[in-house]
Swiss-Prot record:
HAMAP family: MetX_acyltransf. Keywords: Transferase. Its EC number is 2.3.1.31. This is Homoserine O-acetyltransferase FUB5. Belongs to the AB hydrolase superfamily. MetX family. Signal peptide: none annotated. Pathway: Mycotoxin biosynthesis. Residues 77-400 form the AB hydrolase-1 domain. Residues 1-13 have a biased composition (Low complexity). One of its GO terms (biological process) is methionine biosynthetic process. It is an enzyme of class 2 (transferase). Homoserine O-acetyltransferase; part of the gene cluster that mediates the biosynthesis of fusaric acid, a mycotoxin with low to moderate toxicity to animals and humans, but with high phytotoxic properties. L-aspartate is suggested as fusaric acid amino acid precursor that is activated and further processed to O-acetyl-L-homoserine by cluster enzymes aspartate kinase FUB3 and homoserine O-acetyltransferase FUB5, as well as enzymes of the primary metabolism. Pfam families: Abhydrolase_1.
Length: 427
């Protein structure tokens, strides 16, 4: 991949203070790819060497993060927030109503931090960052190595070490972030005190793997994908938009879409009697208008007859403006590797039983991607866990929507699990 954007300012070396001679670099870089400005104010710590689970060694690995609040004198009031698939380190962008004084992510009591995952376009090493941190080598693109949820957590632990963190009070996240939460638990209760996994799984199911493959296939089918060897100036937008549409349908439920759109056409002059609807003049007796010829069909064509179609196309376009196709493939492949038992135990049940921390599992009955049954399995098997339901018919996305319920559930759990932090005065 190539770009003409400005190279970053040189970072300042900082020793980690751990006595092992490792040097990290901390900087706020200038734009180097189309996604660099999407998360204003993020900071970067560069880890000089990092070996992935696969055995691949990466050099000069940037990790983007954002933080709020103050680290306590004992460096033990850290709250880690783990982002979902398409999220960034900016918690205020996607869980903003939970962040701030007196809220679940109380910045008067906690040092709140969110670190960006490997493969994401928002600052951490990914297909849109320079190979081994060297811009003369070009961008990773399709050559970005496969990474795992466990890789992310190990890398993020190095960032916390660099920042002087001694103990983590709580780790909270949903969906892919919930997978990270569960992996953090394996650092032990002496390091991580409590966890909150939401709308997630102990291992990626065949159902979720199948949906991910359908999305990747949509991207690879775009003629502009070119086996991942595309440029920033002409990316495979249509494939990425198709993938996003598919994903959106797994994030919501049938009932939520029916309630919101029904058979609405978005036309204020539509007949009151829905039975009198007539087909538009451009209707055609095929399922996909894109299959009529070899000409790519843009998703912003004004041939949407139903509001549900317009919604999907609008959301897909918004997404393609802020995300990268190779990053999407890297992240969805990462999800498929998720398995708490891998390399630890023979079964998922045995792996879950090793988690010692107080655990609040949050599930959504209408979630068709990471089902309530999967949350029940986690809560039933983790020794010190309890399950609470987010009541919503909005499907998987309810963990990002039902802020009032989330805040109430989280604050109650944190008071119960961390009374020393929750009851003390603001820092």
């Amino acid at each position: 991949m190539t770009t003409t954007t400005t190279a970053p300012a040189l970072p300042t070396p900082i020793h980690d203070g751990l006595g092992n001679g490792t040097t990290y670099e901390r900087s706020i870089p200038r734009p180097v790819n189309p996604f660099s400005n999407r998360v204003p104010g993020r900071e970067i710590i560069t880890v000089p060497n990092f070996t992935l689970e696969s055995g691949v060694e990466m050099r000069n690995v940037p990790v983007a993060y954002m933080s709020w609040g103050k680290l306590s004198p004992k460096a033990n009031n850290v709250m880690i927030i783990c982002h979902a698939l398409s999220g960034s380190a900016d918690v205020s962008d996607w869980w903003g109503p939970l962040l701030g004084p007196g809220k679940a992510f109380d910045t008067d009591k906690f040092f709140v931090i969110c670190m960006n995952s490997l493969g994401s376009p928002y600052g951490t090493a990914s297909p849109v960052t320079a190979k081994n941190g060297d811009y003369s080598e070009g961008w990773y693109g399709a050559d970005f190595p496969a990474t795992t949820i466990r890789d992310d957590v190990r890398l993020h632990k190095l960032v916390l070490d660099r920042l002087g963190v001694r103990k983590v009070a709580a780790v909270i996240g949903g969906s892919m972030g919930g997978m990270h939460v569960l992996e953090w638990a394996f650092f032990g209760k002496d390091y991580v005190r409590c966890i909150v996994p939401a709308a997630t799984s102990s291992h990626q199911s065949a159902w979720a793997i199948g949906w991910g493959e359908a999305q990747r296939h949509a991207i690879r089918s775009d003629v502009k994908y070119k086996n991942g060897r595309y440029g920033f100036d002409d990316p495979p937008i249509l494939g990425l938009e198709a993938a996003r549409m598919t994903a959106l349908l797994t994030y919501r439920s049938r009932d939520s879409l029916e309630r919101r759109f029904g058979r609405d056409t978005g036309n204020k002059k539509k007949a009151k009697n829905k039975g009198s609807e007539t087909l538009p003049s451009n209707s055609t007796p095929i399922h996909s208008q894109g299959g009529a010829d070899e000409t790519p069909v843009a998703f912003d064509r004004a041939d949407s007859n139903f509001a549900a179609q317009s919604y999907l196309r609008y959301q897909a376009k918004k997404f393609s403006d802020r995300f990268d196709s190779n990053c999407y493939i890297a992240l969805t492949n990462k999800l498929d590797t998720h398995d708490l038992a891998r390399g630890r135990t023979r079964t998922i049940t045995e792996a879950l039983s090793l988690i010692e921390q107080p655990t609040l599992v949050l599930g959504i009955r209408s979630d068709g991607l990471y089902t309530l049954a999967e949350q029940e399995q986690i809560a039933r098997t983790v020794p010190n866990a309890k399950l609470r339901e987010i009541v919503s018919d909005d499907g998987h996305d309810a963990f990002l929507i039902e802020w009032s319920q989330l805040n109430w559930l989280l604050v109650g759990f944190l008071h119960e699990s961390l009374p020393d932090i929750m009851q003390r005065a603001a820092l």
